[in-house]
Amino acid sequence: LLKLMQEYPYAEISVKQIIMETSLARKTFYLNFRSKDDVLESILNELIREYTEALSKENVDPLTVIFSFCDKNKAFLSLLHKNKMLYLLLLRLNEFLPEYSKTEDMSSNPFAKLMGELEPDYLIAFNVGAIWNVLFKWIDRGMVDSLDSIQETLKKYLKRISA
């Protein structure tokens, strides 16, 4: 699917093209997926799983994880952007992060420190939206700006507002 998305708009890609590109039998495809949307959903779920694993490591900086994730997945993010589908990743993050925050130790998370005892669901949505818009701006600019400099700018800003 991703290879096809490099050549064709997502809306124009058919299941038949996916089957031909992957040399899968039609029956095998339909045993695993109902549609091309299911294929894309599977890819998104795998990315979120990888992101979760990276966040779950001890003493990680969530901003570093976010920017490393984006750097590693530049090509995929670019394909989603080209097809006006970046919102799908945002939806997945909005589903995942509130649940994740309830099950993981958030004591080293700078966002958790800002939240304190406040209602987390709205604050998580606020933070995801803020980070998302920064990433969207980076993608929209062609991913030419250094992620390290963007991350450093955000860290300085967080330090200012938490002082």
Language-model segments: what does each one mean?
Residues 4, 73, 130-137:
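Amphipathic alpha-helical interface segments
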Residues 2, 6, 11-23, 30-60, ...:
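An amphipathic alpha-helix adjacent to DNA-recognition modules
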Residues 58-106:
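Helical hydrophobic small-molecule/effector-binding pocket
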Residues 86-133:
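Amphipathic alpha-helical packing segments from all-alpha helical-bundle domains
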Residues 54-55, 74-80, 108-111, 138-142:
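Secondary-structure edge/capping motif, primarily at the C-terminal ends of alpha-helices
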Residues 128, 137-163:
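C-terminal peripheral helix-coil segments that are non-catalytic and often amphipathic
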Residues 41, 45, 49, 64, ...:
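Generic detection of well-ordered alpha-helical segments
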